[in-house]
Amino acid sequence: MTAQLIDGKAIAANVREQVSRQVQARRQEGKRAPGLAVVLVGEDPASEVYVRNKHRACDKAGVHSVQHKLPADTTQADLEALIDSLNADCSIDGILVQLPLPDHLDARPILERIRPDKDVDGFHPYNLGRLAQRLPVLRPCTPKGIMTLLQESGIHARGLDAVIVGASNIVGRPMALELMLAGSTTTVCHRFTRDLESHVRRADLLVVAVGRPGLVKGEWVKEGAVVIDVGINRQDDGKLAGDVEFAPAAARASYITPVPGGVGPMTVASLLENTLFAAELHDGMHA
């Protein structure tokens, strides 16, 4: 069996186009464009690239985006004051704080200070709690994007044995909630998991998000499994690699995401969807 590639770039482009059409429809109804504020602290090169990509995607979709670039020595109090002002700004529907923050700043109270209805990253305890209650509002972007990849590829998660490798707050844990909501029997593997291979071998649907190139051996992949590789790791030769050994996994899987061009584009597309959804929430609040 040779796996069919799940083209995240193409699916993300369709999502962005859909958002663009809905934004245009809003404007024709006399409503304002959705507004996204992106907060960047310090000068981390990778973060600057991510932020630039987000602004570019917003511009193409007609979403109004504003960047707040703060120096690396910004205090906790100053950052909290900025969040408070953005919470009160009626032109801003979504607030995104680009992680990681400099070491002297505590990200948790910053993320929790964002109003839940403006939390377009989906990291606020309120939004994670709603997802756990099976009543999602603003959903974490990467897991939401993965669910869109599955849906657009005609893959039904209901009844599948799903295994998630990685238990981060950003991907692994909310991914488990998404898959349970979709009807999968879900196992989460982490650094204390014994015999990772045995869990991977029984997975109908495998999601790997650890940040270790080649962690999951291709020979472990069950024949006909769906493989979603969230990892993106730069190797010594400068090439990008996922957390799964791609070629041997693709020889066994039915579907697989490439790295790059699989999950990554969906994260930004989901951010646009969340920002539009937040704007619609605010329409209802101010009606």
From Swiss-Prot:
Q: Name one GO biological process term.
A: purine nucleotide biosynthetic process
The organism's place on the tree of life at top rank: Bacteria
The answer, when asked if Hydrolase is one of the entry's keywords, is: yes
Q: Which GO terms describe its cellular component?
A: cytosol
Q: Which GO terms describe its molecular function?
A: methenyltetrahydrofolate cyclohydrolase activity; methylenetetrahydrofolate dehydrogenase (NADP+) activity
Instruction: State whether keyword Mitochondrion applies.
Output: no
Question: Quick one: which residues bind NADP(+)?
Answer: G166, A167, S168, I232
Q: Which Pfam family, giving just one, matches this sequence?
A: THF_DHG_CYH
Q: Which UniProt keywords apply?
A: Amino-acid biosynthesis, Histidine biosynthesis, Hydrolase, Methionine biosynthesis, Multifunctional enzyme, NADP, One-carbon metabolism, Oxidoreductase, Purine biosynthesis
Name which cysteines form disulfide bonds: none
Would you identify the family this protein belongs to, as annotated? Belongs to the tetrahydrofolate dehydrogenase/cyclohydrolase family.
Under NCBIfam families, the record lists:
PRK10792.1, PRK14186.1
Q: What does this protein do?
A: Catalyzes the oxidation of 5,10-methylenetetrahydrofolate to 5,10-methenyltetrahydrofolate and then the hydrolysis of 5,10-methenyltetrahydrofolate to 10-formyltetrahydrofolate.
Subunit structure of this chain's protein: Homodimer.
Q: Which PANTHER family match?
A: C-1-TETRAHYDROFOLATE SYNTHASE, CYTOPLASMIC, C-1-TETRAHYDROFOLATE SYNTHASE, CYTOPLASMIC-RELATED
What this protein is called in its record is Bifunctional protein FolD
Q: Which organism is it from?
A: Chromohalobacter salexigens (strain ATCC BAA-138 / DSM 3043 / CIP 106854 / NCIMB 13768 / 1H11)
Its gene?
A: folD
